Amino acid sequence: MGKTKGLVAPVKKVDPSLDALFATSVGPAKPRPAAKYSEPLPTKSKKAPVPSKKEEDVQDEGDDEELSELDEEYDSEVGIGEDDEDDEAEDNSDSEDEAVATLEVVVEQGKVPEEDGPKRKRKQPDQHDNLEHKYLSKLAEDDEEPAGKRLKADEQSGEKKDTAKAEKKDDDDSESADEVPVHESLAPDAAQNEIEKANRTVFLSNVAVEAVTSRSAKKALMKHMASVLDKEAKPAQKVESIRFRSTAFATAAIPKRAAYIKKSVMEATTKSTNAYVVYSTPAAARLACSKLNGTIVLDRHIRVDSVAHPAPVDHKRCVFVGNLGFVDDETVLQVKVDEDGKEVTEKKKRTKQPMDVEEGLWRVFGKEGGKVESVRVVRDPVTRVGKGFAYVQFCDENAVESAILLNGKKFPPMLPRELRVSRCKAPHKTLRAIEAKKLKAQGAVPETMKKGNNGKKGPGSKKSDYAPKISAEAKTIAGRAEKLLGKFTARQVIGSDKKKTFNKQDRYQANQRRNHASGANTEATGPRVPGAYKSPESFILEGKRASAADGKPKDLKFKGAKKNKAPNAGGGKKKTGRAAARASKWKVQGKGKK
């Protein structure tokens, strides 16, 4: 017979822990009695009002008096004497000692007896309440006044700075409360702000590079720029800021801002730089341009010019100077062959003392020619390396004659090369302008002259192009508007007085509507072509239109007219012919009949 498997698991495989769970059973659940549900709910006791401290003190005093009276009455009734009271006091002291001993045992075991009844808990204030608001306000304060680096002396006086910071914040709050809010439509435009700032800004050239690297040199420059200001002027005149531009830095591997912070300037390229100085008022800027141009500061002549209204360039007072050095400290590389037959490159400086092109032109032409108004050395905008020529403009035309005599001369060490000095030509007499004029006469326009000149009719503009008339206000800001505001914004500002600009298609449609309204004959003249000239029928004249049927005016006299008229009505020659003969014959016959 085969073995049969039973449903009961073997005893060896039973887990004793699981078997212990089912060893004892509570039994089936018993239903609750009906009386449990029929009983009324217990009423909630109203909480007694919490008495104040004064009321509690008065109530405690009254309770003590009542209890003392009751104790005396009870003692007198029962007959307890002083001896009994002493025994009772001893018993109480013994019970207190026992309670203290039990309490120490409980504390050692770490068990605290629970009090009977529910314990009332007071709601504690949350320490992290309003945490987000505090964090955001702290971030706002950090954004308004970023913390800078503190020195040891500043750390010692930290409390004083905190108090000053709090006072300053209060002052700012009071000022902001006094300020009247302005609607965004009435707020000044960004372009207008730039123009207003340009009126207060002056341009400086041939500034010493020491002003970039040395703090004392920068202070000397600022002091010199503020030396001509009027101290009694209202509003007060002062120098607000200065910024340096077109500086030759040592390397192009890092941004210009980082190179400026590290003071890594390459004086071998050029010892001069440009700067912009912002004054508090336009009057101060005009005063600086009139009195500080050509003055000496940091052992260099500086050129001071207005940004909003730059000085005009007059070719009659300018000379062209060529054959100048490209960099101030030139190094010549010579390749030689040594004894072993190898090529060796030797570095040799052209001059022992480095040249200084821009300052040399100021000094030489100011001494030999006359008073110099400006010196413009043409350089590469990125590397600041010179292109070998410059323009010198004098205050007087007669100084040009003296400057031409310097042609072919050297002035070491600043100008060690032979100078090539010549007169400046008028813009329309330059080779480029003459070439463009010839191409225009032949019917071809060079690629560089095809684009229009900001709405002005130039060599590349067509006669049919619409050129709006520029207002006087737009002309005043057209000096350096593109450099200040950009091409797009400058065109908007210059053409701001025009509400709408019309192109060729718009003008063609307007002419068509006007011709249709006036009843002009478009069939005879043919369809209009955009950009073509207007036909005589499209012109609308005031008054009566002249025509050949109106006859001869009374005040019009022809050249061949005779003074003595013939007796006939025509006033001219007598008619001859068959018709005239018949008419005369008919007249004679008619008179005879009568």
Swiss-Prot record:
Q: What is its main location?
A: nucleus
Note the superkingdom of the native organism: Eukaryota
Which InterPro entries does this chain map to? Nucleotide-bd_a/b_plait_sf, RBD_domain_sf, RRM2_Nop12p-like, RRM_dom
Location comes to: Nucleus, Nucleolus
Ordered alphabetically, the record's keywords are: Nucleus, Repeat, Ribosome biogenesis, RNA-binding, rRNA processing
Q: Where is the composition biased (Acidic residues)?
A: 57-99
Among PANTHER family, the record links this protein to:
EUKARYOTIC TRANSLATION INITIATION FACTOR 4B/4H, RNA-BINDING PROTEIN 34
**What protein name does the entry list?**
Nucleolar protein 12
